[in-house]
Amino acid sequence: ATIIEAPPSTKNAKKSRDPEMHQTKKGNEWHFGMKAHIGVDASSGLVHSVVGTAANESDVSQAHALLHGHEEDAFGDAGYTGVEKRDEMQGKGAKWHVALKRSKIKAMRDGAIKDLLIEAERTKAQIRARVEHPFHVIKNLFGHRKVRYKGLAKNTAQLFSLFGLANLVLARRQLLASPESIPS
């Protein structure tokens, strides 16, 4: 998930912020806005599901909405810790591979087991990195760093179209390289 900022200003007719947006702390910094949660195919890197929530929603609470139902494996960062124990995940066939918190790895004694665990976490991180590419396209190439509208519904609708266009950007090479795309 990524945070998309909303204007925190109260200089409007109602003298209030958007009531559907909330604030959250990321690292040591506070942000006001919404969160975009996405599900990405590990092999192609294309987005298959999008959920927009207030910024104070946890990542793990939206995990069930990010699955399309045919996954065998699902990868998540440390924000998805405990996802397999949640009620809405019961009966889903996906096996979750969640990143360990850094403090757990640091607390281990140096040795072969720690080195093996670090290598396993590195492999999980390489797969999870595919999720960050659509966020890069949306925020850096399209410049969508702040929400444009009031309310989650309108902003989530815009996220659907932006991630659809991001899929075209990410699949550009495959689309142009396929022989079917060349007119005869």
Give the label of every model feature segment:
Residues 1-95, 101, 160-166, 174, ...:
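Polybasic low-complexity intrinsically disordered regions
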Residues 72-73, 78-153, 157:
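Helix-centered, glycine/charged polyanion-binding patches within enzymatic domains
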Residues 118-119, 124-126, 162, 169, ...:
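Acidic, contiguous segments within the catalytic cores of piggyBac-derived transposases
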Residues 138-141, 168, 172:
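Generic structural signal for hydrophobic core residues of well-folded globular domains
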Residues 150-156, 173-184:
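Short alpha-helical "patches" and their helix-cap loops
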